[in-house]
Amino acid sequence: MNVLSIMDDLKRRMDGAISAFQHELGGLRTGRASASLLEPLTVEAYGSVVHINQVANISVPEPRMLSVSVWDKTMVGAVERAIRDSGLGLNPITDGMNLRIPLPELNEERRKELVKIAHQYAEQARVATRHVRRDGMDNLKKLEKEGEISQDEAHGLSEKVQKLTDETIANIDKILAVKESEIMHV
């Protein structure tokens, strides 16, 4: 394993932590309608469990309304049940093969709960980033021990790894701040 591949791997894994964090935040309900709100939901279809977006189109016709167009008439009931039982507090209105889902206003208590959950997701992303940093530092120490890089090179690369970690955590904090203001905005 060479230095370049270690640094590329660290960058890729830290970017992955940010992507996973953003994906988790996408599932949090804010005051605004978003198709990503329903994407994690699963429904039993044709003998297996699949995501809703594999049996229907999800769109946002209005800022506080989601629309789900189910492709197979036999799946409408299952999709409606999945949305109703999701714990998101949504009540779909069935209209043939389409479901309209009005998003109710979030109360202050629920908003604070969502912010708390967002902070938990952010902490998970920070921890994942720190684990990646630790792996990178261990690899650099191993290369130094094996004599592939000098002590000075190892020190310089360690600083680069720390800088990359700091940038990634700052990015996570920035994304969290945007999501927090989105949730708390009435």
UniProtKB/Swiss-Prot annotation:
SUPFAM superfamilies recorded: Ribosome recycling factor, RRF
InterPro entries: Ribosome_recyc_fac, Ribosome_recyc_fac_dom, RRF_sf
Alphabetical keyword list: Cytoplasm, Protein biosynthesis
Main location: cytoplasm
The keyword DNA repair is assigned to this record: no
Domain of life: Bacteria
Pfam family, one: RRF
Molecular function (Gene Ontology), one example: ribosomal large subunit binding
Subcellular location, record wording: Cytoplasm
Biological process annotations from GO: cytoplasmic translational termination
Any one of the GO CC terms: cytosol
Protein task: Responsible for the release of ribosomes from messenger RNA at the termination of protein biosynthesis. May increase the efficiency of translation by recycling ribosomes from one round of translation to another.
Family: Belongs to the RRF family.
Protein name, per record: Ribosome-recycling factor
Gene this chain is encoded by: frr
